[in-house]
Amino acid sequence: DLILTSGGVSVGEEDHIKPAVEQLGALDLWQIAMKPGKPFAHGTVRRDAGAGTDAGRACHFIGLPGNPVSSYITFLLLVRPFLLRLQGAREIALKTIVLPAHFSLGRADKRREFLRVRRNAQGGLELFANQSSGVLTSTHWADGLVDHPAGATIAAGDTVRFIPLAELMA
């Protein structure tokens, strides 16, 4: 029902998945305004004649980014609900909690960001210092994500939308 890959869907010299999928089917979506996770792809791949009764039927394709945090975040936020829907689940909307930020983020990004954070003893959220998509330790340290809208900044004390990782793992 689904072909899921990690890496190879960006624009680098060694990114071969995207052209292969385009040759065997079609991409409906490529690159999204999300950080981490911009090189994300969705499409379909046709099954070949050797697939028996499924021959010619399309199979879903999802290509995750290659950076580990980007792959992790896009899987939780995009692939997990997709899989739940394929399985017939009706309730897939994320439950968020509004909590105060105990950090500042002075730069506004053009993309919607999902920041790795954790709750502290004071009931607020701390930001992992290095939000790079290659720093996998941020996912171990964090207990949730802040859904940070494009073009916005965060001042300490502002309320933000917190998505508990436990919600995404259930």
Language-model features: where?
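Flexible glycine/proline-rich
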Residues: E22-A170
